[in-house]
């Protein structure tokens, strides 16, 4: 019976027979085609006139208006830095608790399931919740802290579990306090990589401010999101947008320089004079890191000191969650796709499949074209283009292109695909550039084309990273589509926004809880796969 499904390649490894792989490929292809048919509409030819008018309006800014750009930008810097630092610190502690290779199962599993549960809440829910409890600056700080804590925990945990832990176990076995051993052997030894992660998360959180402004979060993103809301005023967008883009480009350049000259590890030099020079460089690097830490700490403390911690409605949280978990069963048996949350989830899944298919194809293309296989001019030009795409607010792109596409969900998918592909393309380029140059040069010397090298060497070599990218992009796609539901990007996201605005928290819970279960099941399956608990993935499909 086993031979019907698998063939043996070694004593411990099997592979699926080719016809089952073919059947699986056909099923996946059919699902993708159905998802595209279900979610894509044609172009609205008459909408091109509105598109050109909107484009002209965008580049005809209202220069007489006082935008208070400095005040809004400084406000954003305060709460993003503060929230990112607080979230990162909490994430370090939770990553220590949730790492299966560090903690016993009875500690790691419940803690990880707890973070998965909290992460399953759409970010809109807690943004709206904080808005009802606190003033704008505290709401913004808490939202960034919440977001950074939960998502940083996920990635830092994976990083810790993939680290060399021999020294940690040696120290912890010598009756040294376990956390102290963890700090000395894992955190300190990998400080450069953790700093890099913090800087990249800071940069990502600044980009997220425009999206979070949809949910009422204050800051410079508010100056962009508000004119793009109900009554679109494109002439008010350009000046704050250019300010934000300029700041993001400055931030990207700063992160690049810090990565290149401060946080990048250097190999040990053999020559005495080179060693002395290396030690001198390390001293300067330490000074720069201390200065960076002081600047970030200063912004964090300054923000925390000036915050107003007054709670507007102390009883609101208890009342909210009491209603939130009182689900309406009539919704679950309705045949209307605009009412039944299960049908909404089915629709959301097809949207996510369409989105990640586009993201994966575009990111692979971007990563390939920006890699070392192409000329330096081509690579740098594309990297700069991807950088510009990443810093342009996705809300603006949606408003610009929406008139020329019949359905808003199609526009959202295209906009998110381009934005996400620009980010993931950068990661894929790094993975491709880290491949064995000797093998690539040898293949080029034998006359193999770039596409042949991509298909037969780069993709197979980086398959684990590509699969991780694919799985992460599906999870992120679901959450992004929910956020953009306010603009018609998804039914379920639109309903969450409507029910919160009307204070219909029971209906909100009825719509949100199935989505949370859906996300939790996906994360638990993904966790099991990554920890090799589901051996069929590793042994039969890999």
UniProtKB/Swiss-Prot annotation:
Q: Which domain of life is it from?
A: Bacteria
Membrane spanning stretches: 23-43, 77-97, 114-134, 140-160, 212-232, 236-256, 287-307, 350-370, 386-406, 412-432, 481-501, 509-529
Topology with respect to the bilayer: Multi-pass membrane protein
UniProtKB keywords: Cell membrane, Membrane, Repeat, Transmembrane, Transmembrane helix, Transport
- Where would I find the ABC transmembrane type-1 domain in this sequence? 349-526
The listed locations are: Cell membrane
- Note the SUPFAM superfamilies from the entry: MetI-like
Q: What is its main location?
A: membrane
Cellular component, GO annotation: plasma membrane
Q: Domain comment text?
A: Composed of two homologous domains.
Please report which protein family the annotation says this sequence is part of.
Answer: Belongs to the binding-protein-dependent transport system permease family.
- Would you tell me the protein name for this molecule? ABC transport system permease protein p69
In which organism is this protein found? Mycoplasma pneumoniae (strain ATCC 29342 / M129 / Subtype 1) (Mycoplasmoides pneumoniae)
Please name the taxonomic classification of the source. Bacteria, Bacillati, Mycoplasmatota, Mycoplasmoidales, Mycoplasmoidaceae
Gene that this sequence comes from: p69
């Amino acid at each position: 019976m086993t031979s019907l499904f698998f063939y043996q390649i070694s004593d411990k490894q099997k592979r699926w027979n080719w016809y089952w792989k073919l059947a699986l490929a056909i099923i996946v292809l059919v699902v993708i085609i159905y998802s595209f048919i279900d979610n894509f509409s044609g172009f609205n030819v008459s909408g091109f006139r509105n598109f050109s008018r909107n484009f002209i309006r965008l580049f005809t800014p209202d220069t007489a208006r006082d935008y208070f750009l400095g005040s809004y930008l400084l406000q954003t810097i305060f709460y993003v830095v503060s929230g990112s630092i607080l979230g990162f610190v909490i994430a370090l502690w939770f990553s220590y608790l949730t790492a299966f290779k560090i903690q016993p199962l009875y500690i790691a599993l419940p803690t990880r399931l707890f973070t998965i549960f909290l992460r399953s809440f759409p970010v809109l829910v807690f943004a709206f919740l904080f808005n009802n409890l606190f003033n704008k600056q505290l709401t913004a700080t808490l939202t960034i802290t919440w977001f950074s804590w939960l998502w940083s925990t996920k990635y830092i945990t994976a990083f810790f579990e993939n680290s060399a832990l021999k020294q940690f176990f040696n120290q912890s076995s010598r009756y040294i306090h376990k956390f102290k051993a963890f700090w000395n052997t894992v955190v300190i030894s990998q400080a450069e990589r953790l700093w890099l992660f913090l800087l990249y998360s800071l940069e990502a959180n600044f980009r997220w401010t425009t999206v979070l402004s949809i949910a009422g979060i204050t800051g410079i993103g508010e100056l962009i999101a508000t004119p793009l809301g109900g009554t679109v005023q494109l002439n008010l967008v350009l000046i704050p947008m250019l300010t934000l883009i300029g700041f993001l480009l400055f931030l990207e350049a700063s992160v690049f320089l810090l990565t290149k000259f401060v946080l990048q590890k250097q190999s040990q030099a053999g020559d005495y004079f080179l060693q002395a020079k290396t030690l001198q460089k390390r001293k300067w690097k330490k000074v720069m890191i201390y200065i960076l830490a002081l600047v970030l700490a200063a912004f964090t403390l300054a923000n925390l000191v000036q915050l107003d911690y007054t709670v507007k409605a102390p009883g609101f949280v208890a009342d909210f969650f009491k209603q939130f978990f009182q689900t309406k069963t009539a919704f679950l048996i309705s045949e209307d796709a605009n009412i039944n949350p299960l049908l909404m989830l089915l629709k959301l899944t097809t949207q996510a499949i369409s989105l990640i298919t586009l993201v994966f194809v575009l990111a692979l293309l971007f990563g390939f074209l920006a890699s070392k296989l192409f000329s330096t001019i081509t690579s740098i030009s594309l990297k700069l283009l991807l950088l510009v795409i990443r810093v342009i607010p996705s809300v603006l792109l949606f408003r610009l292109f929406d008139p020329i596409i019949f359905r808003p969900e199609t526009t959202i998918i295209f906009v998110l695909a381009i934005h996400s592909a620009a980010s993931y393309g950068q990661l894929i380029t790094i993975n491709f550039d880290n491949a064995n140059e000797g093998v690539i040069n040898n293949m080029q010397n034998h006359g193999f084309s770039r596409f042949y090298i991509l298909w037969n060497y780069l993709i197979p070599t980086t398959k684990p990273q590509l699969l991780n990218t694919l799985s992460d992009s599906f999870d992120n796609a679901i959450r992004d589509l929910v956020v953009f539901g306010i603009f018609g990007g998804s039914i379920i996201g639109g309903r969450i926004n409507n029910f919160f605005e009307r204070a219909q928290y029971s209906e909100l819970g009825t719509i949100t809880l199935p989505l949370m279960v859906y996300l939790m099941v996906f994360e638990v399956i993904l966790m099991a796969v990554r920890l090799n608990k589901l051996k069929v993935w590793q042994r039969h499909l890999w």
